[in-house]
């Protein structure tokens, strides 16, 4: 068996949570391979809305095993709140959720450091979510991190050493803070975590594959936020691309099967950073309103713009995408004209590839297509798609070189239409 990978192709918020929920019936295991509680997956299940930050989206399927992999960073306090809310709503998870011993813990002082570093940058700040993600990955790479497995071995000594080191840094930054409440909630989270299965997830995932079980790897955020290939330095601190599934779960590259790439029919970005197709007019405001574009974790208003095919082609290439999934098609239902960025103009020269740096001086070059002016939310199959919408799909497939296998026409899992079903 091979593992399939599901990931975002833009700047995050593409709708991965819903798609994982739609795909999970086909899989035995769902595993998160990177990121932390800085990104939320929003799902609507049986009329109720859920936001998952650290827990895999397969948790709503009663017979699935869910794994938090070694590439994830975990905040015990936020995990406890998320898990308790799920259990209170009728979704037990203690027997179905396994946590890698090698996953790194977000400490209370990591969150304080996050705020202190951002404050020190002034106008040059990246716009982090303040959840301590960057400082946690920094400790991981510098070999100073505290891992889930450490909860069972010399925990107090390892936590105390990390805390003391962080306090020295905060002192040098002259940053005032109060750790009392954060640390109290965090320690309660540590005790709660002990109720779950701590596993060597690399062995577990590979044993499932050896036994013929199907595994879906779930990414967080999006390709354009990848630490190496995203719009640096306005990126996250982990590898959000397909290769991250290998390092974040312990899966060999030759075990990767299908790669599902998710994108919106338009573009959004939350926080600071370059965004070539961003709209600052009423069209952008309309997208934001119709798409309910507010961050699921931070509540921040998302910046909106037309689809960027230069960046999207780059993402398809980097990830080796085999199937595309287009989300939020219905948000564009009322637009007379749909625009798509097909090239950039940089220093007066038109280019059709993603350059080293897009932080400034990038002007989008657009193709225009007629809008479909049809309510897509009630549609049940691709046979009902209007001609203009089919033309948009064909245009995108020709530009990207990959079939759009699934189209989402609303937030509910039922509002999901599969294409090319005759194959």
UniProtKB/Swiss-Prot annotation:
Keywords: Cytoplasm, GTP-binding, Ligase, Magnesium, Metal-binding, Nucleotide-binding, Purine biosynthesis. Mg(2+) binds at residues 13, 40. Its cofactor is Mg(2+). Binds 1 Mg(2+) ion per subunit. CDD domains: AdSS. The keyword Zinc-finger does not apply. This is Adenylosuccinate synthetase. It is found in: Cytoplasm. Pfam families: Adenylsucc_synt. One of its GO terms (molecular function) is adenylosuccinate synthase activity. Substrate binds at residues 296-302. Homodimer. Pathway: Purine metabolism; AMP biosynthesis via de novo pathway; AMP from IMP: step 1/2. It catalyses: IMP + L-aspartate + GTP = N(6)-(1,2-dicarboxyethyl)-AMP + GDP + phosphate + 2 H(+). One of its GO terms (cellular component) is cytoplasm. The active site is at 13 (proton acceptor), 41 (proton donor). Its main location: cytoplasm. Belongs to the adenylosuccinate synthetase family. IMP binds at residues 13-16, 38-41, 129, 143, 221, 236, 300. GTP binds at residues 12-18, 40-42, 302, 408-410. It comes from Bacteroides thetaiotaomicron (strain ATCC 29148 / DSM 2079 / JCM 5827 / CCUG 10774 / NCTC 10582 / VPI-5482 / E50). Its EC number is 6.3.4.4.
